[in-house]
Amino acid sequence: MLRNTLIHCFFFFSLYGFSQSNDTTKVVKRIYQTNPIQDKEAPTIDGVLDEAAWDLVPWTADFIEKEPDENTPPSQQTKFKIVYDQKYLYVGFRCLDTEAEKIEKRLSRRDGFQGDWVEINLDTYHDKRTGFSFTITAAGVKGDEFISRNGNNWDGSWNPIWYTATTIDEEGWWAEIKIPLSQLKFGKSKEQIWGLQVTRRLFRKEERSVWQRVPQDAPGWVSEFGELHGLLNIEPQKQLEIQPFGVTQLDTYEAEDGNSFRDGEDFKLNAGIDAKIGITNDLTLDLTVNPDFGQVEADPAAIALDGFQIFFEEQRPFFVENKNIFDYRFANNADNLFYSRRIGRSPQVNASTTDDDFTDLPKNSTILGAAKFSGKTKKGWSIGVLESVTSRELGTIEDALGNRREAVVEPLTNYFVGRLQKDFNERNTYVGGIFTSVHRDLGDQLLIDLDNQASDESSELAGLRENALASSLRQRAYTGGLDFRHNWKDRNYFIEGNFVASHVEGSAEAITETQTSITHLFQRSDASHVAVDSSRTSLTGTGGKLTAGKSGGGNWRYDGGFYWRSPELELNDIGFLRQADEIQQFANLRYLFLRPTKFYRRAEVALNQYSTFDFEGNYNFIRYHLFGFINYKNNWWTEVGFGHKPRIYSNTALRGGPRWRSSDDTYAFLFFGSDQRKKFNFTVGYDGSRAAYNDYTFDRFVVRLNYQPLDALSVSFNPELRINKDKTQYVTTEDFGETPRYITGNIEQNTLSASFRINYTINPNLTLQYYGQPFISRGRYSNFNYVNNPLAKKLSDRIALYNPNQISTRDDEYVIDENNDGQEDYSFDNPDFAFVQFRSNLVLRWEYIPGSEIFLVWSQGVNGDGDTSNKLLKSLDNQILGQKPENTFVLKVTYRFIL
């Protein structure tokens, strides 16, 4: 282990010296001088710059090409002006075009960024890391994003209120925008200096030109902006917006005989309120009471055979907006101290029922209210505080006699997140911290008899009066962290790190369940450094990461470092943690081809390596990966990669059993696509892997088809096929006398999915969108076996196959007579599965005035278990097209008051 670690360190640090000579190209910062309107009439936003106010400042031009041929004159020039008053910032653009008839005027929803567009970015904090982006297309479609991490993150969920108009003439096109200062954040000073950048996209040539040159080898985006001067005596505007909403919802479905909960339809009325209150210009308080997210698309279907939880992206507007402030990813991309999907999650406790019972269970926990205090001050303080309360959720159970009772399936819960960062050293350094807490009200009463029939309660139901909540859920959970980043040498080099700690408390049963969960698996039979302690009522763990590298300057980029997650680290109450008990070392190297040639516009090659260990010192995994990307001159592209995993050991494959060795694995992928600007474009790809001796194979085939027959209409169809074959897929654990048997089998799993989208933009404020996704996954098992030597190199030595005399079937289970004495030793259920699902959304969205919307939504869903003997396409016909779907119709109306 030590030898390999030294080799990897040498591999990384040798690159450091190799790359030191590459420096970022020095560029002079441009300055734009604006003027106030004062006694002039404010511009009317109509796409015609004919008001006298525009004569207060000259045009600024001299744009420079950024893509594809950086630092050359662009094909078409661009000019702009900026003026302001005490309430608004006004920007006028003149996008010259010698072939005005070829201007692309594609329509889309907000943030679609289709066709020709022009964009202004404002770093109002002048922190060289964050900014506000406003984009307007030639067709008049808005785009707006909040920029963070020096251009590495663009958050399209930020939707401020602003105004725009465009016109087209024989010399090009005009754009005019008006931005309320209340939608921007800046400090109070006599003269403001903001970072400024303007970018234009010439669609037909896929050319981008900029006002302030940003070299291709620059270490970021916002840090390279020019400056906006002349903003005198403008007062920060406190934002005050209140947005009430009302929702009606009708659910229809096939009625079930005898089930009073499923009579064919349900009708609901709901109302709530959202608000934005500017505490200062820098800091905003967001409030939501009884929020509704009926217009949000459902999550894509997925099946996890490895037992781990699946990470789903946040789509709910309240939690998406300003999420960058609360982001605290400390190890890999998913591990985070704050995973907002925990708030309003599906109930975690199952109501105890019999086969004759009917149930009515909530799909999600109700968010009673949430408050978010966030922003960034002129002095470099980033602040984020979030508080939310979800209600106590009850499931209703009805027995065969019609008696009803209620069971608590989710307790009243309070969630808190606090985040703080401070910039130093001319914004080249920051340090920060985070704290989270979760408190659950785990009361004693779980069962409520609605018919006052406690005296007739069966012994089975009486057992439910024990506090199942306390035995299943942790009562309190706390996490905290510190992080930092330092950049030097014009931000070309960096070092960053973080440290996290967690502490969870609960009953002995709840903490035992935590210890034995897939994240921890303290019950592993061969682990000497962890063990289940059923008397414990708390766990405390740590984690962290340290990375250093080169992010700009010349053609080379690299970084390397390590992270760790201790065995007792637990984040899943309000964060996301897939696996604890891991230490990882990593090294990455990239080479960027910065200058286009006759063959390509841009290209890159990357090599990376990482190794993992556990806290017992076991060397578990190593991977080498080579990646290449090329964007050809005609805007087609290819992405290719391959890698090798010569060492694969898993502490989780046997779900609490001993450490397991897998055969060496080699994988590859190839994707290529056509010019995405064309009316019809496509992407096709393949990725797959092969283990030694074909112990494991995986193949995935991907097609992405996009067609835009009209400027206002686009259609996409994205089918995908996955074929997974594994000779040792874990099935279950059974006892053979005093010996546990870890049973695996040969699985052949085929998964077919597709997504289908239609977007029709009637005008920039009125859109119709359809989304549909069929999903079918079928898994068949054979050649069942048990593990007898989990660390053997060859598969045949790792497992023992059951022979025909040892295994037989009974009903829907397998019966094992391992010692051939004619008696059943143990049995397990048939693990074959066929899951079928169809989801669709049809959404009509009308922004009837800026910030106020009407949504009409029609959602459909079909879920079921298919026939494992059917072919995939037959399951599509029988289980989806042949079933009556569940329908949901939603009307949601919002109105935004700006006070």
Describe every region a protein language model picked out:
Residues 208-210, 298-301, 395-399, 443-447, ...:
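Short acidic, glycine/serine/threonine-rich loops at helix termini
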Residues 366-368, 374, 490-899:
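Exposed, low-structure sequence patches enriched in small/polar residues
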Residues 52-60, 185-187, 294-299, 306, ...:
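Short amphipathic alpha-helical segments with coiled-coil-like heptad repeat character
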Residues 235-286, 415-530, 595-597, 603-609, ...:
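Surface-exposed extracellular loop regions of Gram-negative outer-membrane beta-barrel proteins
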Residues 262-263, 306, 361, 404-411, ...:
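Alpha-helix capping and helix-loop boundary segments enriched in small/acidic/polar residues
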Residues 1-24:
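Bacterial Sec-dependent N-terminal signal peptides
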Residues 92-93, 97-99, 128, 181-185, ...:
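A generic secondary-structure signal for well-formed alpha-helical elements
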Residues 20-423, 432-433, 453, 467, ...:
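Structural preference for beta-rich elements and adjacent junctions enriched in aromatics
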